């Protein structure tokens, strides 16, 4: 205790005060290092934010080391700043390698470029999403889901091809690439609930889609709240697009357009809808769906 008090006394009370200050300013290297420190500590989060921080802090420590070696000739100041520069450099190389080593199959690259990259989703986050999914092929006239039979146990995004959506043999709308196949079904259930499809989804052409199992995706949401909010936004937007696409297809009577968002649509539309030519085509394709 006495040693600690004597050390504190020698550092604070017995340390000579600065009676005279240097009139001349430090060299440009010192001020450059200070500027790099200020700008470096303004870095953001995420992998690219860390690259920004460690690159500028490393340059700041390197400038301080040069200043200590050239201007004030202080070996201890030079040593500490150089060690800190090496640490920042190693961190920068490690993070850059992590970012560069992220590779995906072609389908995932297309999905990221078209759906996730425009939203500013970093590659490491997308890698976490992709690791929980699988790429599946669906041949023409085969079914992804059948009305009243297929359970809702996954969530999928179409990568290529086109899916035809029907209910009781009546055509509703198409699903195009980079749209969810089953966003309305997913949104209609709570995590603890189970359900079956109320529509039939048939491949109009050869298709490929990325699919997540329901339980695995909910586990991912529980671990990463950011990913949960991201999917909530994507699914909500996709459902809105499907509603507008379906609204454009609905006609009541002779060329009278009816808005499906009106509350009494369900009771008015079903009896008056005439069967479309696609009904027979859908029935002919049922043999593929039952396999």
From Swiss-Prot:
<keyword id="KW-0472">Membrane</keyword>
<comment type="similarity">
    <text>Belongs to the popeye family.</text>
</comment>
<keyword id="KW-0812">Transmembrane</keyword>
<dbReference type="GO" id="GO:0042391">
    <property type="term" value="P:regulation of membrane potential"/>
</dbReference>
<protein>
    <recommendedName>
        <fullName>Popeye domain-containing protein 3</fullName>
    </recommendedName>
</protein>
<dbReference type="InterPro" id="IPR006916">
    <property type="entry name" value="POPDC1-3"/>
</dbReference>
<comment type="function">
    <text>May play a role in the maintenance of heart function mediated, at least in part, through cAMP-binding. May play a role in the regulation of KCNK2-mediated current amplitude.</text>
</comment>
<dbReference type="Pfam" id="PF04831">
    <property type="entry name" value="POPDC1-3"/>
</dbReference>
<feature type="transmembrane region" description="Helical">
    <location>
        <begin position="27"/>
        <end position="44"/>
    </location>
</feature>
<feature type="transmembrane region" description="Helical">
    <location>
        <begin position="77"/>
        <end position="99"/>
    </location>
</feature>
<keyword id="KW-0547">Nucleotide-binding</keyword>
<dbReference type="GO" id="GO:0016020">
    <property type="term" value="C:membrane"/>
</dbReference>
<feature type="transmembrane region" description="Helical">
    <location>
        <begin position="48"/>
        <end position="70"/>
    </location>
</feature>
<keyword id="KW-1133">Transmembrane helix</keyword>
<dbReference type="GO" id="GO:0030552">
    <property type="term" value="F:cAMP binding"/>
</dbReference>
<dbReference type="InterPro" id="IPR018490">
    <property type="entry name" value="cNMP-bd_dom_sf"/>
</dbReference>
<feature type="glycosylation site" description="N-linked (GlcNAc...) asparagine">
    <location>
        <position position="4"/>
    </location>
</feature>
<keyword id="KW-0114">cAMP</keyword>
<keyword id="KW-0325">Glycoprotein</keyword>
<dbReference type="InterPro" id="IPR055272">
    <property type="entry name" value="POPDC1-3_dom"/>
</dbReference>
<keyword id="KW-0116">cAMP-binding</keyword>
